[in-house]
Amino acid sequence: MAFLKKSLFLVLFLGLVSLSICDEEKRQDEDDDDDDDEEKRGVFDIIKDAGRQLVAHAMGKIAEKV
């Protein structure tokens, strides 16, 4: 009976250790993804501002012709 208790304790302990390692890796991956999201937002803002300027310039040219 003591052998079964020790075996069960060992299995549970190893399971918890592997679970905590997986959680740490998941957190690191999420942190990396957050950095990528910030870069994507920065690029999107640049594209959006360029589009606004292009539309404003085109509208100005159309207004001059009318």
From Swiss-Prot:
GO terms for cellular component: extracellular region. GO terms for biological process: defense response to bacterium. The modification Valine amide is found at residue 66. Residues 1-22 form the signal peptide. Its main location: secreted. Pfam families: FSAP_sig_propep (PF03032). Expressed by the skin glands. Residues 23-39 form a propeptide. Keywords: Amidation, Amphibian defense peptide, Antibiotic, Antimicrobial, Cleavage on pair of basic residues, Secreted, Signal. It comes from the Eukaryota. InterPro entries: Frog_antimicrobial_propeptide, FSAP. It is found in: Secreted. Belongs to the frog skin active peptide (FSAP) family. Ocellatin subfamily. Has antibacterial activity against Gram-negative bacterium E.coli ATCC 25922 (MIC=300 uM) but not against S.pneumoniae ATCC 700603, S.choleraesuis ATCC 14028 or Gram-positive bacterium S.aureus ATCC 29313. Shows very little hemolytic activity and no cytotoxicity. This is Ocellatin-PT5. It comes from Leptodactylus pustulatus.
